[in-house]
Amino acid sequence: GYMGCRTRVIGNVVDEDKAVTPGRGNLSFTSINLPRLGIKHGIVRNDETDMKGFYEELGELMDLVKDQLLERFEIQCNKRLYNFPFLLGQGVWIDSDKLKPNDRLRKILKHGTLSIGFIGLAECLKALIGKHHGESEEAQKLGLEIIEFMRNRCDEYAKEYKLNFTLLATPAEGLSGRFINIDKAVYGKIKGVTDREYYTNSF
């Protein structure tokens, strides 16, 4: 899908004059399963919470997702205008009216967003420190720190590649159900973490 309903398009890195939401879609996004990282580095399975290990692995995962998004972006860019007559013929995308049918799509797709999604912040916090952001001030603070860490990394990618990398809370009940079933199989039932139908996807 080209549009993610929750994509908050935050300023167009590529071209300041074109910082408008219409005309840019969400090119693709991949979600990070935060509860799994929380379980691996948190108090639920260890003597103490290892935030250093948590952030290291989160950073590595984000780099993997970034590479995957870039790879997909390159594939999309190598398509030509005639592959998408409706989307582009209607002038839906910024600059699409300037392309000829045989032009590659990079010129216009660079205005789109590459989104790194995250799921299950509440369960992640519960696994890390035993409480989620609705239950304690400390958890609330940590939750914001985790989001800020991810947001800053997205901003770094955006600067480095001159593309619109954004962070979004994944609206994916189906996906979060799949994640939780895998984690339940691997780590068993953990109260407040894997003992539910699906991971929450809100802040």
Q: Which functions belong to the PLM regions below?
A:
Residues 114-127, 148:
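Contiguous, well-ordered alpha-helical segments that form the cores/surfaces of helical PPI scaffolds
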